């Protein structure tokens, strides 16, 4: 690629893949493979837009360091972009995220601060400590730090309104009838969802995990505060589908066995929701947001027995390629 600039950073335009082996009726199921973004997840979009707009508006300059609360993928994307553009990056993360995620952020030049938090709850009800810590640092040293704040930054919403939504509409030739997405900050489902609703009668479905879940990147809103990005446009969501850990990890296994896809836990939760929808004998075309693949979850999948030995061997080779 050469020197990284905003002009040659190819974020977006990820493919749609039909999951025909998982269809069971008249609902066509397509997955948007967001791990095909340059830094491996859907969060590349928000990170790219937040930094680009911050520089353009003069909120971020080379004398500042970037700090962000993240459950993983935004931190990875920001670490990559920060390193390429010459910024120092600090990720404030929940202790519960996978070791692979923490290691990768560090290998990309970022520093990691851990908090017990409900961004990926495993310790009971939290108080969004990662967000609170990052905000307190910025408030104490406003001349030294810039926090993109994916939970409130309109650039997060715009990234999906301007890219993800239009890509889905174009790729399906306007035939999409359902959008199914997990929710972390709410940027994806509100941005892509609003765009699609403006085009036609599209049902927007939000996926919510169980309490005390193990699905990195998603939120249970009985445990966690509703991010401002989501709260101001929450009515865009027509329906919520609850998914348990067992359902999500069963869907991860199905994706591997039936489609040869090694997907992350949040993608498994989204697939589980689609399979529930499929049982309702609905006609149409559903697009699922697969936020990332399984490469950062080798330890978790091994511990929980999510994949078989052959699948884990493939995943281990992918992880080794990233030097975890």
PLM region spans:
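PLP-dependent amino-acid enzyme catalytic core
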Residues: 1-324
